[in-house]
Every structure is written in C-alpha cells, then in structure tokens.
Amino acid sequence: MLLLVRSRHSSVPRNSMLVRRLILVFLALFSLVVAPAVAEGQQSEQESRRVSDPPTLRRSLRGVLGGVPMTAADSMHQEIVRRLDFDSYKQLLLGLTQFGDREQGTPRNEAANDWIEDQLRSWGYETERVHYMFARRVGDVAEPREEVFATKVGASRPDEMFIISAHMDGRGGGEAANDDGSGTALVMEIARVLASSDIVSDRSLRFALWNNEETGLNGARAYVEQRAGMQGIEDPPGSGRYPEPTWIGMIQHDMMMWDHGNPVTHNQALDADVDVEFQLNSEMAAESAQLGLALINANRLHATDYPAVLSNAMSNTDSTPFMDLVAAVSLRENRRLYETGNRANPHWHQTTDLFETFSDADFMLGFNAAQTTLGAVAKLAGIRISR
C-alpha cells in the first residue's frame, strides 16, 4: 500500500504533468465560457469575479463529467454527509472568533473553552476535560491548563474509537480564524451532525479540541501521556463502559481554508485542494497511509468542490504525538513543511487572520474537508441512519 503513496514534492512523470496542465487549461476555458453568461445578468464586478472561484467551476465540471457510482452503504453515508451545513460551519467559526486569537493562558482562551463545551452540551453530548500543567520555559512555575472533548459512544464496539480533532488555541493578535478556528469549527460541525438521535455509530467517536498546540502540542501530548495506557479497559468491569476506547485512527484538522498558491494570489487557486498528510518516518506509517487513502476515496465520493491529495511529511500538528501509536493523519490547506512553512499563507500567526479576511471560496475549502472526514469516518466507524 505504501508503494502507492508519493509525496507531492517528488518528481512527477511527464504524462502526469501533461494531464495536470490539460486540466488547468480546461478549467480556464470553462471559466471563459461561463463568465460572460453571468456578466450578461448585470451582476456586480465582485459577483462576476466569483464565477471564476474554484467551487463554482468544480460544481459545473462535476455536472458535465458525472458522478461516481455508489453502493447502498455509500448512499447512506452521502445522506449523512449532506447534513453538514455550510452556513452552520461559518457560524461556528464566527462564534470562535469572538474570543480573539484564544491564546493559551489568557481569559479569552478560557472563555473559548467554555463556549466550545456549551455548544457540545447543547447538542446532547456529555463533555470531559483534560487537565494538565504547562510551563513556558524550563524553570518557570507550571500553570494549570484545560481542553475539552466529547464522545459519541459506539453501539456495538464501544471499546474502539476514532479521534476527530483540531486545536482551539491560536496566536498572532487577530482572531485565529484560520489557525485554527477553521479546524475547530469543522470538528464541531461534524459533532453537531452526528449528535442526531437517528444516527448510530458502531465504533465510538471522540471530538477533541486541543489546547496549547501553539506552544509545542502540549495539550495533545498531555492527552497521550494521561490516557494511552487506559485504552480498551472496561471500567467498572462488566459495565460496558470504556473511558478510553482503543484508538483505531486519529484525524487532525489544522488550518483549513487558504490555498491561494505560492506566489500567493488574491483568489483561491484553481488547483486548490485538501492536503492529507501522514508521517512516513513513524511506527504506524503503513496504517496511517491506509487511513489517508480512505480519506482520499471519501473525498472523491462526498466532497462537492475541492479534491484531496495525499503526502507523507506530516509535521508540527497535534497528530504528531499519536503517530507512533495509532494510524494518524492531518488534514490541511497546504502541506505543512513545503508550503505553509514557505509563506504560502500570509495571514499565518498575523493580525490579519480574521473572519472577514476569507471569502466563501476559502470557507468552502474547510467545509469540503469536513465532508471528506465525515465521509471516511462514516464508512470506517460504521455510521448509519436508524430508520
């Protein structure tokens, strides 16, 4: 399976490059056909420019090229994925931005944790908190920190679990809308959909919103340190309750909305995509690659606008502490090391990381990542609608 996985920065066969160029040419020609028709409707300049956004183009292309044949199970999973709501995703993200950048150790971080917990409880979840100590530097007095998670207990395999996560803290003095309000809102929107009383999951699902990612993945590391040894233990014996089900897979979401190319362009790039990363140099690389491929396949079936691609250099996010223990992947707007790390996002950790900075084409990239994750987990965890 690993032989099928190739990093996007490796050399590309000439025929693959030709196909890629032909696709881009086709997209450009398609925009030339559609844009004049819209302009005739006397729309504003901004509305006319929106026609060339990737979501509009890809929706039209899917209509031309046709869909992917689905099984009955795929169709049910599609019905579940369609319960995700774009406006709800945006409203959750907007709600998070009221707390500014949610920097760890600040009152706004604590208030955001409370708000996240209140939202999860309003959908019917019982929530828990991970408590840990954090010191900024060696020798500093450690201070208490907290992070929230909620669980949908599996109907037939409550002892096994997928972790769906993002980090709720940020920095930079803005609103941390993209880093990582976009991932946090994504996880919360999936949790909202799966809270419905008619949705059943065979395996347990945990929605974790990490704290202290920006200071070195401290919240996720604390979770692993405290709970890895608890996996699969029934407590009390015979109760059917598993405080920490055995980890089957871990899916992290970190910076989900900005793929404007590098050099950066004003609009979302025509070849924008959801990046799924695993770490080749990890103990669970083969299993992580398989999880990544499941997400790629789910994207092809369920995502409405943006494709997904797989690469093998996952880094600098909360799935890292898990990667030697369980299949672990990270979903992102760009590859972390080769694109984000090379200034592909000018708003990263800046005061401009604001809700108002992003367009619907940007929000849609994050929403398509939600479709991708929910579609994959629906199949892997055995999620279904009880009729």
Language model segments and positions:
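Structural recognition of the beta-strand scaffold that forms the well-ordered cores
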Residues: 89-97, 128-129, 147-151, 161-165, ...
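Alpha-helical metal-binding/catalytic segments enriched in His/Glu/Asp
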Residues: 150, 164-217, 373
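Active-site-adjacent mobile loop/cap segments within catalytic or ligand-binding domains
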Residues: 258-281, 309-387
